[in-house]
């Protein structure tokens, strides 16, 4: 039985949300031993090497280069710098919460610049996902989520979310004409080359402790490489707005990842309720999804690319 393309798109973003949820915990562990610039370099270098064959016979229109440069510089250079330095200056719970703001900016930019719209029922389900993510990440214990005490770090995480939201919007447009793998590879090259220059200028040591290396490789392969491919595939099949709407479910997986890496932590009743609300809202969002054919009202982002909708 063949799985419909739209269903594959929803499955892709759900899996991507799991990987995205693991990102803060893995990053926090790695940053305890490795300089932020070195982390940003290596987690982009590894998938860039793996995806390098995709550049063969790639042709990019001259008119696409400004947008491609914007997505690469903002998403692969500026965002990692702001994010990793912000992550060092805030708590793990804050980082899980504020990572969801990338989805918010992706949705807002899709609405404002891509002309994407959702149905009233989808907006309702989207609200349920947002509320569930809020419950999971805060547990309604606002004294523990120290926003004021970690204001600079929190603001930096929000700034990184704006950068990634901008890059996502640019990528959504580019994916209409450029296949997923080559687009991601070019963006990773922007990041790799930039940090290859910044690392020696900053004097950061390149040495990575052997006990941290597995976490770093896992971060590069899953939270950067696999996540980006699945994320872009969802962009092309269900649109940027719906992709951004489902991404906040990463908060649930983020809490579970934190529980795995830090076994002394436990899940509260509020978190269980929030997780159930997110999963239920996700099911509702899929069941009541609106039309997305080429003539669907108000939506402009379509899965059109030079290699067809099913090819990466």
Q: What kind of region is each of these model predictions?
A:
Residues 1-38, 43, 144-173, 256, ...:
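Glycine-/small-residue-enriched transmembrane alpha-helix faces in small-molecule transporters
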Residues 5-9, 33-37, 41, 60-66, ...:
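Juxtamembrane helix-entry segments on the extracytoplasmic side of multipass membrane proteins
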Residues 13, 64-73, 118-130, 178-187, ...:
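Cytoplasmic-side transmembrane-helix entry/capping segments in multi-pass membrane proteins
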Residues 19-26, 55-99, 133-135, 220-238:
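Specific transmembrane alpha-helical segments of multi-pass solute transporters/efflux pumps
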Residues 30, 39, 86, 112-114, ...:
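Hydrophobic/aromatic residues within transmembrane alpha-helices
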Residues 32-78, 105, 163-167, 184-203, ...:
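Transmembrane alpha-helices of multi-pass small-molecule transport proteins
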Residues 39-42, 80, 95-101, 170-192, ...:
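Helix-helix packing/entry segments at the starts of transmembrane helices
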Residues 46, 51, 69, 109, ...:
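Hydrophobic transmembrane alpha-helices of multi-pass small-molecule transport proteins
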